[in-house]
Regions:
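Active-site-proximal, substrate-binding regions of enzyme catalytic domains
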Residues: 42-93, 133
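Phosphate- and divalent-cation-binding pockets in alpha/beta enzyme and binding domains
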Residues: 21, 40, 87, 129-130
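Hydrophobic side chains within alpha-helical segments
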Residues: 8, 43, 108-111, 127
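Active-site neighborhoods of divalent-metal-dependent phosphate/nucleic-acid chemistry enzymes
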Residues: 75-125, 158
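Structural signal for conserved beta-strand scaffold positions within catalytic alpha/beta enzyme cores
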Residues: 33, 79, 140-143
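Acidic, PIN/NYN-like endoribonuclease modules and their adjacent C-terminal/linker elements
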Residues: 1, 113-158
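Short, well-structured N-terminal submotif of metal-dependent ribonuclease cores
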Residues: 1-40, 44, 48-61, 148-150, ...
């Protein structure tokens, strides 16, 4: 199983730069993400509608496709429990002031770390830079050729 943040989830459905590389990586394993990633993904699609990057019919089709995949179990949505929020508090307590870490990114990183993932895939430079503070590695395959991984390479303990 591999962990995607929202920047990668969006590329599974929308042809942003790097979408082909993200889709190729997704084809190598099952995809997991924090449960709040669903809301972030839908919000990103709505932003594209608001900004005129997609038309209303395409927006409706995107939402329908996402809903169908969610109902089919295409993703493993990871919940945030007390351990996740404890991890977030601990990281922020010792986080250097120079590190830019948004709350939603902290939720992704803590969720992944507490769920046993050792790698988070993202195209978000701030999230990637902060990953080490959660004891995990951030990777970006955009502009690279993804290498298929075995499930155990992504989970420390499942």
């Amino acid at each position: 199983m591999i962990y995607f943040d929202t920047s990668y989830l969006v590329r599974l459905y929308y042809q942003d730069a790097g979408a082909d590389a993200v889709r190729a990586l997704a084809a190598t394993d099952h995809v997991a993400s924090a449960a709040h990633g669903q809301a972030e993904m839908i919000a990103a699609f709505h932003r594209k509608l608001r900004e005129g990057a997609v038309r209303p019919a395409a927006y409706a089709a995107l939402l329908g496709q996402v809903q169908a995949h969610i109902e089919a179990g295409a993703f493993r949505w990871l919940s945030q429990d007390a351990e996740v929020f404890s991890r977030i508090r601990q990281v922020y307590q010792r986080l250097p002031r120079s590190v830019f870490l948004r709350a939603a990114d902290a939720m992704h990183l803590a969720t992944a770390a507490e769920s046993g993932f050792s790698i988070v895939y993202s195209n978000d430079a701030h999230l990637l830079a902060a990953a080490q503070h959660f004891g995990i590695q951030g990777k970006n395959v955009i502009g690279q050729t993804p290498v298929p991984h075995q499930n155990s390479a992504h989970l420390q303990n499942e």
